[in-house]
Amino acid sequence: MSMKQIKNKPNRSAFDLSLRKCFTAKVGEILPVFMKECIPGDKFKFGLNSFTRTMPVNSAAYTRIKEYYDYFFVPYRLLWRYFDQFVTDTQASNPQFALSLTQSSSSVAARTPYIVASNVATYLNNSSSAGLKNEFGFNRALLSYKLLKYLGYGLFSASSSNQFTAGNSAIMLNAFPLLAYQKICQDYFRNTQWEKANPTTYNVDYLNGVSTKIDITPLLSTSAKNNRNLFDLNYCTWNKDLFTGLLPAPQYGDTAYIQTGQNQNVSFDNGEFSADLSSGVVEFDVDSNSNSSGLVNANTLLRGSAGLGKTDSSNVTGKFRLTNDEFSSFSVLALRQAEALQKWKEVSLSGKQDYKDQIEKHFGVSVPDVRSNLCTWIGGQVGVLDIGEVVNTNLQGINENKNVSADIAGRGVGSMSGRDEFTCSEHGIVMCLYHAVPLMDYEDTVTDLFMFKGSRYDYAIPEFDSVGMQSVPALALNPEFQTNLPIPDNSTGQANLTTDFYKSLGYAPRYVDYKTSVDVVTGAFTRSLAYWAAPMSTDYFQSLFSAISNGQKLTPAFFKCNPSILDTIFAVNADASMDTDNLLVSCYNDIKAVRNLDYNGLPY
């Protein structure tokens, strides 16, 4: 007898979840401005209307800023893999995970992962007193407090001396909003080529027992203080250009090589070195103090004209390389294999390092987000924040020549609207994140790549266009990054720009200077009129990346938008405090949802 037809028939009703949120922001910050829980069967219609003003600008600055709103869906199972069993209460009869070879995970706690308010306040206070800073030198505790407030953890408060308290210190708070925010930032706002994934910020699969309390005590240890965690506010990356689009290596992993020989056993007979000469490389391992029969003095081999010049008595390992062409040759098949391996490595590095993107890169198949354990991007809106002029010609501006002096200040205004839809098939959270990014300008200390050309091979040659990436010299971005550079010798015809002659910032497509340009600010805008523009300056680079002069690579912070970039155009410099926010935003989320719930919640 089948019970297939026995199903619950839930009521389905429409609900208005619209709300307005007024908030302040800085450029670069990724801020949650809307969040709602989802249940299976939900159908959402998102409408967005946003209006932004800026704090007073020092001038009618030639700075361009874009605003972004993005909606995401984060399934709970990506944050805590036991959620499906938890919500259906089937862990006893249908366990899904094993704890060991002989034990199933048959018990799941009675509540979802949580944090204790008093523990969070303790963490914030300890972080503040320890002076912990983020990658831009801002107080991490204040930024964590801001994130908690924007997510809706309203019971936390901060004093003027940056001391934090919780309204009900013993209350247990759901951790899913924090984890979902970090999951979105890891999936969509991380430069995957330069920054490794950090699942510890969003995943709590380790909570598989009776308790689901997230113990944040380890975050206070010395070893963990400098690591990012679930309380950290994140920053978006710059839009990609010549420098922010660089890759850390010309391919994924090491360069592919063709092996021209193999290891062989070595034997000694009456003091003479002998080996199987069927390959081009012979390896040996000799104890120089060996008393083996037939080997009177190994030093003769190690120090002789045909040896390695070994001078001590320790064990040695080395190679005798045969120069016979017969032994050093390789097959065309080996060349094909090396080329295929190199191609695979270069294609792998060109995209994100998750399953979805890698399969699309190599197989040309679009894989659903679920196969890469990614949260889902629903949609979003983009707007432009324009800075216009405000001219003051009142009598207080009369100068000594009895002429009216007009002061030109500025104000920024932006607006946008749009609509998106989404149908939910599992439990999770819908979250909208806001961020604003200036379009990058560089100070005139940036050197055009053309200036580094010397050899004929530095100029574009179509035959060499597809041989791989080229390095971008650090000197092109900042003259302080390389002060002791030898004068290039072009007598040999060796290319300088398209090789690693210069210390490298990273790698870009070959002949990249023919394929893109960067925006530059020069003249008085870099000196007396600096408040009219907000370029990436020498001081900005040097404060963050002085280590590059020692040959080190860029850090992930280089690719993130620093709120301090606009300090020149605003009267107040950016710091960790919300009081220095310079974007004033009013956002109306027109949200309609159809859900498997009754409108009144009554049985009649």
Residue map of PLM features:
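Intrinsically disordered, low-complexity segments
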Residues: 1-604
